[in-house]
Amino acid sequence: MKVLFVYPRFQRHAQAHPELLEYVPMNEYLGSPSLGIAALAAVMPAHWELEFRDDRLTDAARPTDADLVALSFFTAAATRGLELADFFRAQGKPTVAGGLFTTAMPDVVLQHVDSVVVGEGEGAWLKLLQDFEAGGLQRRYERIPVDLTALPAPKVSLYIDGEGPSFHPDDYPVQLSRGCPLNCHSCILPVSMTKQLREFTLSQVVAQLDQLGAKGKRACLTEDTSWLPGKGNRLLESLFDHLIAQGKEATVSYVGISMPMILSTPIALLHKARRAGVTMFYLVGGFDPVTMRAFTGKDERQLERAHKAIAKCFEADIEPYTSFLYGQDDDDVGTVDRMLEFARASGIRKAEFAIFTPYPGTPSFARLEAEGRITSREWRRYNDANCVYQPKQLTAEQVTEGYLRLWREFYADKSYFQDRCHDERTIQF
């Protein structure tokens, strides 16, 4: 039997706002698909044949000889994902879907597919395959708990084998853990992966790094919450110790982290990360108390903490690639100036800017929908480049204008990026 996995395309920042290509002196960078499809492919029974289509590279809406079509998508790709589901069902193909949007809005997706997988996929996926082979698909499969330490490595070769001139990432994601005990207002992770922090073993992580290294790729550690103080730090420290001992300092490209995580992490661990080859932090902003308040003009303490977090990165010789989120309820017309001044004063060299987006399944979406402030359910617009709700102090037009100004003015004096090597002058926008 044969399954066709499909990763739907979505509108990127520079597609929504082509002027960004004029503002930013970098190459637009197409990153790897998320790990969902690769994780399911890894647990497929041996008698199943696999095919993968990345709709970002070539139009996936074409006939297939597969027995089953499986789509995985997050909110920004949901409009296209549902279009593709309709296409394959019209071709007479049983079609199923999973991913973050499906987990958040299963009833919406069920209008377009034969079956959905809600939540963490591997266990439910195997049950779905058993039912399909027996001729009796259920409409809905809920998460079945799995032991992470027993899972095989995601089959990222599906992605790497599809590389070409327009798609050749320098790195691919590697997970150290799943789940998160926090409840950030705009994050779906506790819903999709539960609030329990569960870890892979060090040997599993090292095996994934070695597989990528054999393909000439590095790992980016951005798909989990491993920098949470305590247990997660211990696994990270063990990984860094391994990389240093093995002389594999070029294995990890960058690591996802937040300002509170930086502030709570001992400087010795940051120095160890640098010795292990970590040269850049992807500094996620807008979800935590520091970055939600630092640029409001009303909280000097959080602004000071933000400066300390950036200074701590520089102290460890790790570049803070900083993500700024604009358009939240506490933001006003002066927030853009305050963000730009902070970036200048703190010495940030590389940044990205996004519009606050209340994703389905998050506390923010539920609250704003209850307040009648969601202004669009056109899911393709939920890509961090459009204002899809009504902020308290700004109009949607002001949010868009401020977002574009952030990109334009931050990169106005950074033409030197044009002369940098490939991995130094690429940015996903």
What is the predicted function of each stretch?
Residues 96, 117, 140, 253-255, ...:
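Structural detector of well-ordered beta-strand residues that form the stable sheet scaffold
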Residues 156-321, 341:
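Radical SAM [4Fe-4S] cluster-binding motif and immediate context
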Residues 224-228, 258-259, 326-330, 354-363:
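Short, solvent-exposed turn/loop segments enriched in Gly/Ser/Thr/Pro and often Arg
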Residues 1-212:
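Acidic, low-complexity intrinsically disordered segments
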Residues 2-22, 27, 41, 334-352, ...:
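C-terminal accessory regions of radical SAM enzymes
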Residues 113, 274-280, 346-349:
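Glycine-enriched alpha-helix->loop->beta-strand junction motifs that scaffold or abut catalytic
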